[in-house]
Amino acid sequence: MKKKGGRILWLVYIDASVPRSRGRVLPRGLAVEKPSLKEVVQALEELGYKFQVFPDKKYPPLWFEEKWGYVVVETNEKIREIASKVAGKIREMRR
């Protein structure tokens, strides 16, 4: 069922190891290598977003890969803006 009232942030969107043709939305220089759902949740909490987590879901174009999970972020911002902020926060946390 499609979730309403927010933006869906798949982990694939910010993963530097996934090519753009497979779903990455950020440039490779801004993306992070193999982000975990735990890191994304922590970054969203620190950024002050309200969200819902769906860990057992697979990104449809990569259904044959391992489970990625996604987060529904309750905001009207564009998904690229959210992805950029989350990836930046994850890079900051990994230092």
From Swiss-Prot:
Which InterPro entries is this protein grouped with? Signal_recog_particle_SRP19, SRP19-like_sf, SRP19_arc-type
Any idea where this protein resides? Cytoplasm
| GO MF | 7S RNA binding
Keyword RNA-binding assigned to the entry: answer is yes
Question: Per UniProt, which keywords does this protein have?
Answer: Cytoplasm, Ribonucleoprotein, RNA-binding, Signal recognition particle
Pull one GO CC term from this UniProt entry.
Answer: signal recognition particle
Q: Which cysteines are joined by disulfide bonds?
A: none
The cross-references to Gene3D superfamilies, in alphabetical order and at most eight, read: Signal recognition particle, SRP19-like subunit
Look up the domain of life of the source. Answer: Archaea
Keyword Zinc on entry: no
Q: Which GO terms describe its biological process?
A: SRP-dependent cotranslational protein targeting to membrane
Record text on subunit structure and interactions:
Part of the signal recognition particle protein translocation system, which is composed of SRP and FtsY. Archaeal SRP consists of a 7S RNA molecule of 300 nucleotides and two protein subunits: SRP54 and SRP19.
The family classification in the record reads: Belongs to the SRP19 family.
The record describes the protein's role as: Involved in targeting and insertion of nascent membrane proteins into the cytoplasmic membrane. Binds directly to 7S RNA and mediates binding of the 54 kDa subunit of the SRP.
- Official protein name in the record: Signal recognition particle 19 kDa protein
Species this chain originates from: Pyrobaculum aerophilum (strain ATCC 51768 / DSM 7523 / JCM 9630 / CIP 104966 / NBRC 100827 / IM2)
In the record, what lineage is assigned to the organism producing the protein?
Answer: Archaea, Thermoproteota, Thermoprotei, Thermoproteales, Thermoproteaceae
